[in-house]
Amino acid sequence: MKRSPATRKKRRAPDPIKAWVKRLERTRPNLVRDTLDGLAARYGHHAWERRLDPTSELILTILTQNSADTNAEKAFEALRATYPSDRPAERHIPGPGWGGEGLSDGAPPDWNAVEAAPIQELVDVIRPGGLANQKAPRLQATLRTIREARGDHSLEFLADMSPLEARAWLTAIDGIGKKTASVLLAFSFGMPLMAVDRHVERVSHRVGLIPPKATADEAHDYYLAMLAPNEMYEAHVNLIRHGRVICHARNPEHEICPLRARCRFVDPKAP
């Protein structure tokens, strides 16, 4: 006896991200592998090391939003100098080409003091980073949200969560998106998440790793489906490096690009 339409199980709609990855494997075989290998040949292999404690990483990432890394680093150093803490100094690990070169070894700021600072004082302290009038209240609101949820400003508890659980916890905080959360989790904990900034997005679209209309926010999840966990960190570092060094927004240096043979920006018919 046939089931009535009302009792038939509805077929699940195909996952568009998984469908894209399968299509990519079918129509452009080995594109992902060739991209990873080409980038590694140019920029090397990278093992994860913690750059900063997670709260410092979060605040630094907020400071970098719509600002040059060098300016954001000056603002972070100003926080350290103005609101010193008595915590032990940490050894700073500068990243291979993703920023952080302007930071020194040292203790994180006193986050209680940063949260409680008069707003105009905090604006003046982080002014070197740019957009201080917008970022100062955002920093305090973020610190307040963390403290009210956890009792202090530490984010070390995120290490006990899965990458997606930790990302969801962070993105529930007003003003924190997938990119900011993924930067923190990748650099502070080595979690296999891709933080899609403008460099990663540009390279990904030009090579054809993600759909032409995919947004940066959507691209985070394309990479989760596309890469193995042990590939994510190195791919992240090298994509950022490539976007900064060769695949510029204007006048990309095609003649020295390690991805040239497979880049649809160079040749729309590239295999």
Q: Which residues does each predicted region cover?
A:
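Mixed-charge, low-complexity intrinsically disordered regions
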Residues: M1-D15
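Catalytic cores of DNA base-excision repair glycosylases
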Residues: D15-P271
